[in-house]
């Protein structure tokens, strides 16, 4: 398939495909009994999947030491290409000692199913504190990304991977659209400019506002909710997806929006993850990417607009995707509509600030989000799911 469908090259110039061919799959299955096995957790399995389908292009496997250290320190791969998040496979000392560099390793799902193969090219120890400070800007274990890091094994395994088979998503098969397919669909829709939107929350009025602002200047919106591993207090993916469907059916023009699931796991790395999310959407064929307040943030670890400022650390041609930076949107009681400080003269109590966190807090208290926060149909769906 043409890798430059809709004219937008993947990051690094080539859309990676590491899904085993039928012949390769048969060969791997025949070798399976003799291969050492590693059981992946949910995050590692989603990383394997994203590498295989090209979502993490140009990566064709888990990072080696040179790429890892370059990304941690400089937000670039060893060849100089921008990349802001380490993508690694961490194991215990015992597991690392049991396999040799140069060998083939079977990768199994958390349920024990044979999922893929790693050609082990390197094993290396890494400094968790160094990664935590550079990637997450903190070593505090209460940060969910740091906790995952410190819970992981001390040795990283590197090498190219193959995904044995692309299975339909168990919950959202109709929205499982891989990068090669999204590019083809954008071309069929004759969209030349596409803005990607990353979300792990139900769409509230502030999200709707910035999405529609972006839609005024591009051909299409690619709504790309994350359905991989998130924090335990995030709204479950099936609930969020029903809310997205309601929004698209009632409040967006059908021919201007496309939704697909993002199987990736959240890192909660704030500014660095904003770059990462933008590059992933570039691989899916987007030309633009929405960056709002505290993108991919958690708690108070990052400044409100740090995730926007970080784009200034790269030349636009290096990223080759345009960040659309939006201020914190609010409901303005004076103008009775959504606005930002750029468009509203209101002050203080005239501004009702919205966030996914506030919606989650209201639901946990048994309160229904008001119309200023959420469309009534979405609020009703959330209330039903939370059994208010």
Curated annotation (Swiss-Prot):
Top-level taxon of origin: Bacteria
Keywords: ATP-binding, Nucleotide-binding, Nucleotidyltransferase, Transferase
EC main group: transferase
Pathway given in the UniProt record: Sulfur metabolism; hydrogen sulfide biosynthesis; sulfite from sulfate: step 1/3
HAMAP family, alphabetized: Sulf_adenylyltr
Full protein name: Sulfate adenylyltransferase
Enzyme Commission code: 2.7.7.4
């Amino acid at each position: 398939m043409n890798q430059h469908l809709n004219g937008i090259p993947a990051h690094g110039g080539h859309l990676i495909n590491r899904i085993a061919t039928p012949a390769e799959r048969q060969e791997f299955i025949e070798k399976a009994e003799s291969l050492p096995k590693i059981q992946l957790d949910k995050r590692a399995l989603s990383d394997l999947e994203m590498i295989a389908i090209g979502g993490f292009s140009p990566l064709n496997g888990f990072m080696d030491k040179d790429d890892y250290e370059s990304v941690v320190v400089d937000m670039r791969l060893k060849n100089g290409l921008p990349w802001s998040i380490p993508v690694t496979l961490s194991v215990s000392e015992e597991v690392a000692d049991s396999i040799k560099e140069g060998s083939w390793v079977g990768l199994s799902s958390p349920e024990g199913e044979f999922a893929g193969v790693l050609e082990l090219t390197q094993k290396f120890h890494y400094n968790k504190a160094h990664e935590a400070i550079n990637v997450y800007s903190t070593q505090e274990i209460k940060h969910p990304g740091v906790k995952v890091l410190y819970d992981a094994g001390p040795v990283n395994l590197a090498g190219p991977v193959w995904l044995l088979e692309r299975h339909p998503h168990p919950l959202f098969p109709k929205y499982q659209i891989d990068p090669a397919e999204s590019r083809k669909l954008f071309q069929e829709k004759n969209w030349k400019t596409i803005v990607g939107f990353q979300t792990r929350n139900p769409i509230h009025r502030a999200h709707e506002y910035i999405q529609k602002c972006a839609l005024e200047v591009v051909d299409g919106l690619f709504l790309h909710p994350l359905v991989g591993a998130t924090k335990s207090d995030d709204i479950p993916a099936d609930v969020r997806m029903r809310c997205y469907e309601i929004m698209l059916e009632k409040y967006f023009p059908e021919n201007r929006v496309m939704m697909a699931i993002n199987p990736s796991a959240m890192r909660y790395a704030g500014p660095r993850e904003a770059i990462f999310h933008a590059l992933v959407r570039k691989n899916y064929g987007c030309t633009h990417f929405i960056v709002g307040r505290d993108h991919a943030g958690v708690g108070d670890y990052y400044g409100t607009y740090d995730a926007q400022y970080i784009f200034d650390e790269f030349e636009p041609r290096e990223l080759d995707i345009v960040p659309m930076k939006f201020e914190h949107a609010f409901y303005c009681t004076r103008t009775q509509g959504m606005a930002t400080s750029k468009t509203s003269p209101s002050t203080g109590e005239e501004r009702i600030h919205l966030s996914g966190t506030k919606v989650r807090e209201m639901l946990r208290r048994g309160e229904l989000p008001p119309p200023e926060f959420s469309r009534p149909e979405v609020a009703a769906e959330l209330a039903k799911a939370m059994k208010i």
